[in-house]
Amino acid sequence: SGWFPDLIVGVARGGLIPAGAIGYAIGVKAMGAINVEFYTDIGQTLEEPIILSPQLDTDSLKGKKVLVVDDVADSGKTLDLVVNLLKETADEVRSAVIYTKPKTIFEPDFSWKKTDQWINFAWSVLPVITADGSFKEGS
């Protein structure tokens, strides 16, 4: 599209790996994260997403173009919350996801594909290798 952000904010946890990958791809080194809890298990959510600590310093976004990155726009509630929060201070906020679901309430600016399927990303379903070399199921 020709638009480039000054800063990329990944939605933790699912958006952190895509945010880093996009940062490398477009040469943006300024990265941030915002920690949001919404999904409690596969197909189970809180009533509304909540922002958890530590919180992003939104005052540092003044005068900036910000790209918010998450893995999926499923219900769209998480992206809606984050984008609207960051719009309070940033000059411009756009959003990017890998997948968009048909029933989302929030249409991201950039999306790779649309699907109505549950998506299992390698970074969220494969066992974690711990410091002692053992495996622990992801969560």
For the regions a language model picked out, list residue spans one by one.
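PRPP-associated nucleotide enzymes
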Residues: 1-139
